[in-house]
Structures are given as structure tokens and as C-alpha cells.
A protein has these predicted regions:
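Conserved beta-strand segments of alpha/beta enzyme cores
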Residues: 4-6, 84, 146-148, 188
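Conserved beta-loop-beta/alpha segment of the NTase-like Rossmann-fold superfamily
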Residues: 2-82, 110, 114-120
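A general structural motif
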Residues: 32, 59-60, 144, 291, ...
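Fold-independent oxyanion-binding glycine-rich loops
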Residues: 10-11, 38-41, 66-69, 81-82, ...
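Conserved ATP-binding module of the ATP-grasp superfamily
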Residues: 66, 176-186
Length: 371
């Protein structure tokens, strides 16, 4: 799937410099090569900063991305002498005086081909016996390499993640960014802080989202869509003038065509709900195609799994499914047909047909109980 990505295993893990050394052994770099080193625990990095670093490599040999947090919680310290970077000191190794320096090392660095040749000279002369990539700064001074320090556009973009709390902080920042982008693009959110989006979520015009909605990955939303409270959507295509929820679960493979409606406590999966069709209440629809102008009554279930495989249901145009019905797949309901309430349908229903499997109603007179 990611054919342009090369995966290398660092085993054992002997530091950031060691990781780059492994990369160098597997890849031949020419004199025009550039390398930007990023970290998996810096998810908020901004493309603007990376472009800036790349541009600086036209004049510099090493570019360091720094940032200035209000409180240094353990980041390496960038030491400068007369406006030039002289070294980077790990927080735990820094003196009390150095810890007063405001500029921290994000860990993100960019290298010219000239600087990359020094990677092999990094030693592990430290208490942890690790190869620190930051040691290349001190090495470069010996060769008069040009070093540039740039500060991140936003301090938040340089945040690293070391535990679940910091992951939660980063997720909050990311969600706020996604909400802002969506609302600036015209999406109305009643209580933005309760709406959760994915980075790949796309919106059309005039979309309204009520409180407590989760939109997971691979969701495309069209124009004039209303998503009511407590709905969860994942892997779905939502066309125009669609209403969802409240309390709806839209699972992967769902396509909601124009002017369709999914009501409260309805779950759909791998199904196409066509134009003007409605599933208003308390239903499960899986592996199903519902054609245009279909009404699915409350409590309808498509019984798609027989214990071995999933089977498909087709409900054709203009049909009406009565409440509390079970459609046992594979099954087809023909055009303009009616399924009587409370039916269990196990065989195909022809066009223009009423089908019902209700047991005959009996009346039994009750004897009065003695007091």
C-alpha cells in the first residue's frame, strides 16, 4: 500500500544517531542528498516548518528545529554562543545554569550531504551508551559546517509524546485544529468541543453537526447534511440533503444517497441507501441495497449472517417494510411491495405484492382471579 516507504528495524535501539546510521547503511546518498529526521512521537509537526528547513539547506549544512515552551519538561537544550549554535545538551545532563536557557530541541533536524558524512563519527561515550544524533552539532563545529537554528511556527507542533497523558494533550490540540478548519470552511457545530473528526474527513456546504458526534476515518460528507447528536460515522459516503441520527451508527461501506434519512438507534453497515429512502427508528441494515423511495419501519432487521458467511438483501424501489420485520438474507423484496408488520421474510417477494407471515391471532378468555 505504501510502496514509496521503506521500513527499517532498529534492533537493538541504541539512540537516534544509531537509527540514522542504520538508514545510511541501507541507502547510498550522493552529494546532492538532503535528509530531514522526524520522530514518530511528534504528530503535530507543521508542513510550513519542514518546507522552511528544506529551504535553509540551500545555504546551511545542518538545520535544527527549536522551540520555546513555557516550561521545559525534559527536552534537550540548544546552547548558543554569540548567536550561533554550539551544542545541544540533554536535559538530564544540563547544569542548573543551562536549564535556564529557553530554547529547546524538538529533535527534528535536517542535513546536507556534507553533514551526513559525519554520522558515522558519532560515538556512544555517555552513561546510556547510546549514539545521540545531537552530537553531530559538536562534530560539525570542527569542520566549520554552517548550522542554522529555526524556531517552530507554533510551540505545539514540536510537542513530543511519552505517555498517555501527553497523547491526550496532542489529540486535543489536533481535534481543535480540525474543528477550526471545518468551521472556517462553513461547517456549523453547536458544541464544537464535543465533536470529534478525522484528518481525512471532507465536508460539503451547509453541514450542521449537533453535540457529541464522532466522525472516524474515511468519511465524505456532501451538502446540506444534518448530523444529530450522539451519532458515530466511519468509512461512509454521505451525499446531499441527508439526515443522520440522533444515536445513529453508520459503519464502513455505507453510502447514503441524496435526501435519504437514518433515524435514531439505526445501524447500517456495507449498505447503500438510495434517494428518498428512510430508516427512521431502531433498525439494523447490513449488506443491503435499498433502492429509491423505500420506507423501512421501526424495528426492522436484515438478518445478513447465517453463522458462516454474510448474505445480501435487496429492497427494490417504492417498497414499504412494516415495523418489527426480519428479512432473512439472501432475499429480495420486489418493487412497490409491502411487508406486513411483524413478518419474518425468508423467500423473495415479487413486485407489487403484500407479504406477511404473522401467526394467527387467538383470543383466550381469562378467568377472574379470586381475591
Amino acid at each position: 500500500k505504501y510502496t514509496d516507504v521503506q521500513m527499517l528495524l532498529q534492533e537493538p535501539q541504541l539512540g537516534t544517531g544509531h537509527a540514522v546510521q542504520i538508514f545510511q547503511k541501507k541507502n547510498k546518498l550522493d552529494n546532492n542528498s538532503k535528509l530531514i529526521v522526524l520522530y514518530g512521537d511528534n504528530p503535530l509537526i507543521d508542513l510550513h516548518d519542514l518546507k522552511n528547513m528544506n529551504a535553509q539547506l540551500a545555504k546551511k549544512d545542518i538545520v535544527i528545529m527549536g522551540f520555546k515552551p513555557k516550561i521545559n519538561t525534559g527536552y534537550g537544550i540548544v546552547v548558543e554562543n554569540k548567536g550561533k549554535v554550539s551544542r545541544i545538551v540533554e536535559f538530564k545532563d544540563a547544569s542548573a545554569i543551562l536549564k535556564k536557557i529557553k530554547t529547546c530541541n524538538s529533535g527534528i533536524m535536517a542535513f546536507s550531504s556534507k553533514a551526513l558524512k559525519l554520522i558515522t563519527q558519532i560515538k556512544n561515550n555517555n552513561a546510556k551508551k547510546e549514539f545521540y544524533l545531537t552530537d553531530i552539532v559538536k562534530l560539525s563545529k570542527k569542520y566549520n559546517h554552517k548550522i542554522k537554528l529555526i524556531n517552530a511556527k507554533d510551540v505545539k507542533t514540536a510537542l513530543g509524546i511519552n505517555d498517555m497523558y501527553e497523547l491526550g494533550v496532542a489529540e486535543t490540540i489536533m481535534q481543535n485544529q480540525l474543528r477550526k478548519k471545518a468551521m472556517k470552511g462553513g461547517v456549523q457545530m453547536i458544541a464544537p468541543e464535543t465533536v470529534f473528526l478525522s484528518k481525512d474527513t471532507t465536508f460539503g456546504k451547509n453541514v450542521k453537526i449537533e453535540p457529541y458526534v464522532v466522525i472516524a476515518s474515511k468519511v465524505k460528507i456532501g451538502n446540506d447534511v444534518v448530523i444529530h447528536s450522539f451519532s458515530h460515522i466511519e468509512g461512509a459516503v454521505i451525499k446531499n440533503k441527508v439526515s443522520i441520527g440522533p444515536y445513529a451508527r453508520i459503519r464502513p461501506g455505507t453510502v447514503l444517497e441524496n435526501n435519504s434519512k437514518i433515524g435514531n438507534f439505526v445501524e447500517t453497515k456495507n449498505s447503500i441507501i438510495n434517494k428518498n429512502s428512510k430508516i427512521n427508528h431502531l433498525s439494523y441494515v447490513g449488506d443491503t441495497t435499498i433502492e429509491e423511495d423505500v420506507n423501512v419501519g421501526a424495528g426492522t432487521i436484515t438478518c445478513n449472517y447465517d453463522g458462516v458467511k454474510k448474505n445480501k438483501t435487496l429492497i427494490k424501489k417504492g417498497s414499504f417494510i412494516g415495523s418489527n420485520s426480519s428479512l432473512v438474507a439472501p432475499v429480495i423484496v420486489g418493487k412497490n411491495s409491502i411487508i406486513g408488520a411483524g413478518s419474518v421474510i425468508t423467500k423473495d417477494v415479487p413486485d407489487n405484492t403484500l407479504a406477511l407471515t404473522r401467526a394467527k391471532q387467538k383470543k383466550v378468555k381469562l378467568n377472574k382471579k379470586k381475591k
